[in-house]
Amino acid sequence: MQRYIQRLEEGHDLSPEEAEDAVGKILSTAQDEEIGRFLLALRAKGEKPEEIAGFVRGMKKAGKTIRPKTSFRLVDTCGTGGDGLNTINISTAAAIVTAAAGVPVAKHGNRAATSMSGSSDVLDALGIKTDLEPEAVRQTIEEIGIGFMFAPVFHPAMKRVAGVRKKLGVRTVFNILGPLTNPAGTKGQVIGVFDKKLCEPIAYALAELGTEHALVVHGDGMDEITNTGETYVAELKDGKVSTYTLTPEALGMLRANPEDIKGGTPKENARDLLCIFKGQKGPKRDIVVMNAAAALYVGGIVGSIRQAIPIAEDAIDSGKVMVKFNQFKTFTSEFYRQKNKESLSGKSMSMRSRTSILSPASGERV
């Protein structure tokens, strides 16, 4: 670690292999002081796409992965968070709309970091179980076309850096790695970032990682495609990165005010999402539709985001989204019940085992 820290403090870039090795050490043997110095030195130098790709490979190597079999390109809708705008859970709602429209989704997420409601928080409030084991998530994706991968389950080693990150009190490379480390190996991604300057580096990092089609977006201060102003997009397609801006009008949508898409607590956001799923129109539905359309585009079923807008709208208005939501809720609840049943059965077996090795006559162990 000391060699890597010195290189960074001198302003030198790490090779992808060095970055991968460094994050492996951070997640296993590095001391807190070394981790802190490394993260601050990297932050001061600035992360290069090749370094980001190396960090992602290292994190995936240290974590748990799944490989669901799907008929269409598997996609994820995930943001870095950290925009501080406290909107409704746009990418989470968009994931369910996307799956209802026929493109399989492996949603990667966590609890709230800076907002009141993270993806896991709102799904829990909706009655969808989020902390399933990897095999259960794989089956969920294959059976109903959507699954949720709770970051602490798939990346348990991240606990090692939680204290250091909190103590540093500044954004580090780990603030951008979450959306890039999808455990299902998604080849299509819509990634929202909290800073416009991150769009291109992350798109180039995704190219290094073999992603087929991705949109890295920053819209009017938020880590989403927005209907409140312009969205800056870095698009990775066919191995090339291009940049452009989107407006709601260009997608045939109405422009909204930031207040129109504000969120609240997980329960409040859950109510908003259910209203959208049931067909209620308005700015909150519009922004979900726009982001779902982007996911359908990277999923490969249409040639542009605009072409996907009516597909996303029809998924809601036809009732397909509510059907998919109910499937998601039922399927994850069943896995959760099985998990608890097996856990209770294991405890019962353990108690019987302890009882069986006692002498019936004396109560002494034999």
From Swiss-Prot:
Residues 345-359 have a biased composition (Polar residues). It catalyses: N-(5-phospho-beta-D-ribosyl)anthranilate + diphosphate = 5-phospho-alpha-D-ribose 1-diphosphate + anthranilate. Its cofactor is Mg(2+). Pathway: Amino-acid biosynthesis; L-tryptophan biosynthesis; L-tryptophan from chorismate: step 2/5. Anthranilate 2 binds at residue 165. 5-phospho-alpha-D-ribose 1-diphosphate binds at residues 79, 82-83, 87, 89-92, 107-115, 119. Mg(2+) 1 binds at residues 91, 224. It is an enzyme of class 2 (transferase). GO terms for biological process: L-tryptophan biosynthetic process. The keyword Magnesium applies. Residues 342-366 are annotated as: Disordered. Binds 2 magnesium ions per monomer. Its EC number is 2.4.2.18. GO terms for molecular function: anthranilate phosphoribosyltransferase activity; magnesium ion binding. SUPFAM superfamilies: Nucleoside phosphorylase/phosphoribosyltransferase catalytic domain, Nucleoside phosphorylase/phosphoribosyltransferase N-terminal domain. Catalyzes the transfer of the phosphoribosyl group of 5-phosphorylribose-1-pyrophosphate (PRPP) to anthranilate to yield N-(5'-phosphoribosyl)-anthranilate (PRA). Homodimer. NCBIfam families: trpD. Belongs to the anthranilate phosphoribosyltransferase family. This is Anthranilate phosphoribosyltransferase. It comes from Methanosarcina barkeri (strain Fusaro / DSM 804).
